[in-house]
Amino acid sequence: MFLGRFTHAIDDKGRLAIPARFREAFRGQGVLTRGIDRCLTLYPMDSWQPLAEKVSSLSISDPDARAFRRMVFAEATVVEFDRQGRILLPPELRAYAGLEREAIVVGVHSYVEIWSPENWAAQAELLAAEGPSIAQRLATLI
């Protein structure tokens, strides 16, 4: 389970250290793809597989489903962890998420999100403003 928020530097080669407490679940590799909110999403293989199967089962005749499949799979890449627990963030994914010198690494239970400090600050502001009403709307689902 991934919990917490951490700030890490991105080196000149585009490598990012993943927090030590998260690394064991990845067993040396994971799948990195675009997140929905201008962040990147990093999945352990055992979390990625069920998600990939669900997304793949969406009807190809539905335009929204096709667009979502492209969003999830077109930029997805398998990343390997080096001995220092770093992954390489491909340039196109860094550009999408606005990542430059620093990243906010956020545990979201079964996956990890990687945010630029600016995008994370905007998201945190949104959560502070709308969090109570979001919780109220979703309370019936829990």
UniProtKB/Swiss-Prot annotation:
Q: Which residues form the SpoVT-AbrB domain?
A: 5-47, 76-119
Q: Which GO terms describe its cellular component?
A: cytoplasm; nucleoid
**Quick one: a GO biological-process term for this protein?**
negative regulation of DNA-templated transcription initiation
Entry-linked InterPro entries: MraZ, MraZ_C, MraZ_dom, MraZ_N, MraZ_sf, SpoVT-AbrB_dom, SpoVT-AbrB_sf
PROSITE patterns recorded for this chain? SPOVT_ABRB (PS51740)
Q: Which domain of life, per UniProt?
A: Bacteria
Per the UniProt record, one Pfam family is MraZ
What does the UniProt keyword field contain? Cytoplasm, DNA-binding, Repeat, Transcription, Transcription regulation
> Per the annotation, which location comes first and is thus the protein's main one?
cytoplasm
Q: Does the keyword Transmembrane apply?
A: no
Q: Which cysteines are joined by disulfide bonds?
A: none
Keyword Cytoplasm included in the entry's annotation: yes
Q: Where in the cell is it found?
A: Cytoplasm, Nucleoid
Q: Which GO molecular-function terms appear in the entry? A: DNA-binding transcription factor activity; transcription cis-regulatory region binding
The family database entries (PANTHER family) matched by this protein are listed as: TRANSCRIPTIONAL REGULATOR MRAZ (PTHR34701:SF1)
Task: Name the family.
Answer: Belongs to the MraZ family.
Describe the subunit structure: Forms oligomers.
Q: What is this protein called?
A: Transcriptional regulator MraZ
Origin organism is Thermomicrobium roseum (strain ATCC 27502 / DSM 5159 / P-2)
